[in-house]
Regions:
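Active-site phosphate-binding strand-loop segment of PLP-dependent enzymes
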Residues: 1-40
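Conserved core segment of the aminotransferase class I/II
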Residues: 48-124, 128-134, 213
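PLP-dependent enzyme catalytic core of the Aspartate aminotransferase-like
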Residues: 163, 172-215
Length: 215
């Protein structure tokens, strides 16, 4: 729900625990190219120090190149036993390998790191812009985003002059009264920055100001 990172120390502790307790370890590193911290590490960098660990890390092509919507192809790396089992399962369930997309991703990774970096900067700026707007309108971040393009917010106790009982209620009130659509679950709301936030800055600000939220 909110892009976060794991550093080397955290992965080392996790690998050691899983190794000692015979636990298989999988990490979905889909958003690694959209991480906004130099402390960000990957499981692949650490797991090789644990030769008996059964592990695997997955990477999504769509996110590796910035946000290539529809580029549904990925890559995995890991211990031979884990990869072997995944090959058995995926080989009997997938529709097949999309070679043109795989080739395109390789070209982007090898020849257009500047383009990928530009998307990373763009999403980071959008996250900052949206967070600033919503916080100025009284919304409360659940956690600061450190990767990806999602923001996670606590559900207000009051909005539009009435008490709010759930994130679902608040989301539907926002949709009905302002047209702003979020994703509600548990007691949180998620808002993405996949569109040009600056272009809709005024509309977003007006929407959340009209909500008159409080906690």
């Amino acid at each position: 729900p909110s892009g976060q990172i794991a550093d080397t120390e955290w992965f080392h502790t996790l690998c050691q625990y899983c190794d000692e307790n015979n636990i298989r370890l999988f990490n979905d590193a889909a958003y690694i190219s959209l991480s906004y911290s130099d402390d960000c590490s990957t499981l692949s960098e650490i797991a090789t120090d644990f030769p008996n660990l059964s592990w695997c890390e997955g990477f999504t092509a769509a996110k590796l190149i910035g946000n290539g919507t529809g580029w549904h192809i990925g890559a995995m790396v890991g211990s031979s036993d884990f990869i072997g089992d995944l090959k058995e399962v995926k080989g009997k369930s997938d529709a097949g390998f999309v070679a043109p997309m795989a080739a395109g991703v390789l070209v982007a990774l090898e020849e257009d790191q500047e383009g990928i970096a530009a998307y990373k900067i763009m999403y980071k700026q959008r996250l900052s812009t949206l967070s600033g707007i919503m916080e100025n309108c009284g919304m409360r971040l659940a956690i600061e985003p450190r990767a990806g393009f999602y923001t996670l917010w606590e559900t207000p106790k009051r909005a539009f002059g009435e008490m709010i009982s759930s994130s679902e209620e608040f989301n539907f009130l926002m949709i009905e009264n302002t047209g702003v659509v979020g994703v509600h679950f548990s007691n949180y709301l998620r808002y993405a920055v996949c569109a040009d936030v600056d272009a809709m800055r005024d509309d977003v600000e007006i929407a959340f100001k009209n909500a008159q939220v409080s906690y």
